[in-house]
């Protein structure tokens, strides 16, 4: 069993991981940049070590420094949290080489599912429905025009290494193709260091529904049901809820089985999320897989009564899943909202400040 975990992150997710470590009797190690010396996660952890200056590239993204610190303090595992290095295959691989357990999937799985074109190919081979389009690099605007005529407008261009809505362009008329293609490639390169883009049919009025999954090193896979995240702005999630009010019981079961099959097809180990688009006729299509714990994971925890961080740690320790699919039942309803610190009277410009008062809802069952 893992005995000491370095948390390669900061803020809310670091505090969240420390809580589970404490309940499991596992020592937690916080890392902090110069700017985070007095942060809450530093105060709560059993041990804390500096890893560099305030800029993330020189601290929380410094792979060698993190591994060096983990070895120095005698940790046997690293939890990447979300963001930063959580989906960095190189980091996972270096942890393995150093003899440190990476609490997450294997490096090759991160690579395979992190590239959206590779992920689509894997899902097609596994018989998982995908959105019509091409499963390779789009070579030119001229090729985009030809594909648009084949599958019909509207279409969407996406960055193969993308996420967070970056490197995406919606095309509703052929006159937009040239400009959209150039813009998508440019944004993909600046955001992800990879200008590869692909094209697929744009699903009108979709519901964005994701399924949480867990897989162990013994080949066992379960799904932990659904979260709906259709309320978005700039392709970024604003509201998450579980269960989805859009799904029927039959469709929920079918999508859950498909999500588990998708994870099984790539030999997934750890906690992950299979994301789907569901059209207005309730046809569903694979969108992408997140090979990490997500910000919104507590939505699932609330309706299932599970601690996903603990499950991650048990899996990373080599234990088989203690959950059977028939044991997992949703109870109640859970909603998580993102608060955007923006000025609505000034073009929604960023407007950070101090939250002076919070009134939490209360009542029976809340």
Annotate each language-model stretch with its function:
Residues 146-156:
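Acidic/histidine-enriched active-site and ligand-binding environments that engage anionic O-linkages
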Residues 1-125, 138-146:
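ATP-binding N-terminal substructure of ATP-dependent carboxylate-amine bond-forming enzymes
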Residues 130:
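Short beta->alpha connector loops of Rossmann-like oxidoreductase domains
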Residues 59, 84, 112, 137, ...:
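Alpha-helix initiation/capping motif
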Residues 133-134:
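Conserved beta3 strand of the protein kinase N-lobe
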Residues 7-23, 48, 71-73, 96, ...:
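ATP-dependent carboxylate activation and anion-phosphoryl transfer catalytic cores
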Residues 159:
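N-terminal nucleotide-binding beta1-loop-alpha1 segment
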């Amino acid at each position: 069993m893992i005995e000491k975990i370095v948390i390669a992150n900061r803020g809310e997710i670091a505090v969240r991981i420390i809580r589970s470590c404490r309940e499991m009797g596992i020592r937690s190690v916080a890392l902090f940049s110069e700017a985070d010396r007095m942060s809450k996660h530093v105060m709560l952890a059993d041990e804390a070590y500096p890893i560099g200056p305030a800029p993330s590239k020189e601290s929380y993204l410094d792979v060698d420094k993190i591994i060096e610190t983990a070895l120095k303090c005698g940790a046997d595992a690293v939890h990447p949290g979300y963001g930063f290095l959580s989906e960095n295959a190189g980091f996972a691989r270096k942890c393995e080489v150093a003899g440190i357990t990476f609490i997450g999937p294997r490096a090759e799985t991160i690579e395979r599912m992190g590239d959206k074109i590779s992920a689509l190919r894997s899902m097609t081979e596994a018989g998982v429905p995908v959105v019509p389009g091409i499963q390779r690099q789009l070579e030119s605007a001229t090729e985009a025009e030809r594909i648009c005529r084949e599958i019909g407008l509207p279409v969407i261009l996406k960055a193969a290494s993308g996420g967070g809505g970056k490197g995406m362009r919606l095309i509703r008329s052929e006159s937009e193709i040239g400009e959209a293609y150039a813009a998508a490639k440019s944004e993909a390169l600046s955001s992800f260091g990879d200008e590869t883009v692909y094209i697929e049919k744009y699903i009108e009025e979709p519901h964005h529904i994701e399924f949480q999954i867990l897989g162990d090193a013994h080949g066992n896979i379960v799904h932990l049901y659904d979260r709906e995240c259709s309320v978005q702005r700039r392709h970024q999630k604003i509201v998450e809820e579980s269960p989805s009010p859009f799904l029927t019981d039959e469709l929920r079961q079918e999508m859950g089985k498909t999500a588990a099959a998708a994870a099984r097809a790539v030999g997934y180990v750890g906690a992950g999320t299979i994301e789907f688009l569901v059209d207005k006729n309730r046809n569903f299509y694979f969108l992408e897989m997140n090979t990490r714990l997500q910000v919104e994971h507590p939505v699932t925890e609330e309706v299932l009564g599970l601690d996903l961080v603990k499950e991650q740690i048990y899996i990373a320790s080599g234990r088989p899943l203690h959950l059977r699919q028939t044991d997992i039942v949703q109870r109640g309803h859970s909603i998580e909202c993102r608060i955007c610190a923006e000025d609505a009277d000034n073009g929604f410009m960023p407007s950070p400040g101090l939250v002076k008062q919070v009134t939490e809802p209360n009542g029976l069952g809340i």
